[in-house]
């Protein structure tokens, strides 16, 4: 629970498979877990490498679970994160629920481009007003 916040945040990290059929099953498992185990009013962050070549995770998870994608919320579009040295594809996501996205960005340049095959993404969030 962040200092000064009235409620804890649940943070989940995901790394989905490259194969679409596997990702479909993983979407179902993630959706089932969040629906059954996390109260709909609890602040939630779901982030990671979704290997989302076809940009399906927003529809498969976002709409069904009322999640907002942080980069899209802040910039009006998804930003490329892969490959790190010359990013062309948007494979990584930070989804939030019951949180306000203040800022969201892709960490670029050195050392970020040399640490992984993906550029890391970050978001600054705060409680929703009246939370």
Which role does the model predict for each range below?
Residues 1-131:
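Active-site regions of metal-assisted phosphoester/phosphodiester hydrolases
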């Amino acid at each position: 629970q962040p200092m000064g916040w009235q409620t804890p945040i649940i943070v989940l990290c995901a790394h989905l498979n490259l194969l679409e059929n596997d990702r479909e099953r993983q979407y179902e498992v993630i959706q089932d877990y969040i629906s059954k185990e996390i109260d709909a009013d609890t602040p939630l962050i779901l982030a990671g490498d979704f290997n989302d070549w076809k940009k399906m995770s927003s529809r498969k998870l976002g709409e069904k679970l009322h999640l907002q994608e942080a980069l899209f919320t802040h910039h009006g579009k998804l930003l490329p994160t892969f490959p790190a040295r010359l990013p062309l594809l948007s494979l990584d996501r930070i989804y939030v629920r019951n949180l306000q996205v203040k800022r969201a960005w892709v960490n670029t340049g050195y050392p970020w481009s040399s640490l992984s095959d993906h550029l890391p993404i970050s978001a600054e969030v705060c409680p929703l007003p009246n939370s």
